[in-house]
Amino acid sequence: MNLLRKILFPFAILYGLITSIRNFLFDKGILKSTSFDLPVIAVGNLSVGGTGKTPQIEYLIRLLSNKYRAATLSRGYKRKSEGFVLADENSNAEILGDEPFQFYQKFPDVQVAVDANRTNGITQLLSQNVKPQVILLDDAYQHRKVKAGFYILLTSYDDLYADDFMLPTGNLRESRSGANRANIVVVTKCPKNLSEEKQAEIRLKLKLSCSQQIFFTYIDYDVEIYGKDEKISAAEIKSESKLLLAGIAKPKPFFEYLKNENDECLTFPDHHHFSDADLESIQNKANGRKIITTEKDYVRLKDSKLVSQLYYLPIKSTFINHQQNFDVSILQYIKENLEP
């Protein structure tokens, strides 16, 4: 913890008090939460920064989309539109935000919507001619004006919420006790070979109740990288000199997976809007080499002048074990709460 964060500790106490009072008021029904007559699954985290929400939402889409009419509802962080927007063929990353646009590009049969007001967003989705049967709320763990029926809490293996502090001293949006709302906790970005003993140790550390399930996932990188008109073996590209580009919260694993000693790594803030000056600088740094980026960044850059050099590496969230138990829990919740 750096000195500035230590100095700000009194503000962390104040912020923790404010969020605890807010949660208490929602828990007691003094502040209103709206429920809906269909399965609503909220996915989120206690901390700011990347815990792997996007690949977790994509896992749920793959699980559900062949069985139910699924929809995703996101805030659409840093988008240039306002209010409720339902993705269509005219949508792009500026209208939807990068992550929702990625969902729309990959899963065209799924309704993808954005609205900072999640209550209004769900109401709008339910007013469509084709109504969803289940709604996935992206990054909505603290959005308590909607009472979801099922909560999935994500926490990174190398940054567990049990080891963190409230903002601004740490990165927690609310106190650790907020984890009590979760039906399922997923520890993301684990080592692929994480032992059962270490898994048990983490469960004890997180102090979960008997009714809460815990699962462990790792980042599963694709074996190929993809450009506009071609795909290349990821193993082959590792040996080439290239420019690695990332505008995500925690780019280190991406860089480490692809980097060799001849590569240059270029970072931008999460959800960064690339200016013409940025594009010019990136092109100059690449100097004719391939530019490899994340899938989330690619959706913001694919229509730029970089496209002929630009490639992305897809990732997905893969369970270390007990995947079937996770699937059964989700499907059982939906089955029990689906309107006949």
Curated annotation (Swiss-Prot):
It catalyses: a lipid A disaccharide + ATP = a lipid IVA + ADP + H(+). It holds the Pfam family LpxK. GO terms for cellular component: plasma membrane. Keywords: ATP-binding, Kinase, Lipid A biosynthesis, Lipid biosynthesis, Lipid metabolism, Nucleotide-binding, Transferase. GO terms for molecular function: ATP binding; tetraacyldisaccharide 4'-kinase activity. SUPFAM superfamilies: P-loop containing nucleoside triphosphate hydrolases. ATP binds at S47, V48, G49, G50, T51, G52, K53, T54. PANTHER family: TETRAACYLDISACCHARIDE 4'-KINASE, TETRAACYLDISACCHARIDE 4'-KINASE, MITOCHONDRIAL-RELATED. Transfers the gamma-phosphate of ATP to the 4'-position of a tetraacyldisaccharide 1-phosphate intermediate (termed DS-1-P) to form tetraacyldisaccharide 1,4'-bis-phosphate (lipid IVA). This is Tetraacyldisaccharide 4'-kinase. It comes from Flavobacterium johnsoniae (strain ATCC 17061 / DSM 2064 / JCM 8514 / BCRC 14874 / CCUG 350202 / NBRC 14942 / NCIMB 11054 / UW101) (Cytophaga johnsonae). The lineage of its organism: Bacteria, Pseudomonadati, Bacteroidota, Flavobacteriia, Flavobacteriales. The gene is lpxK.
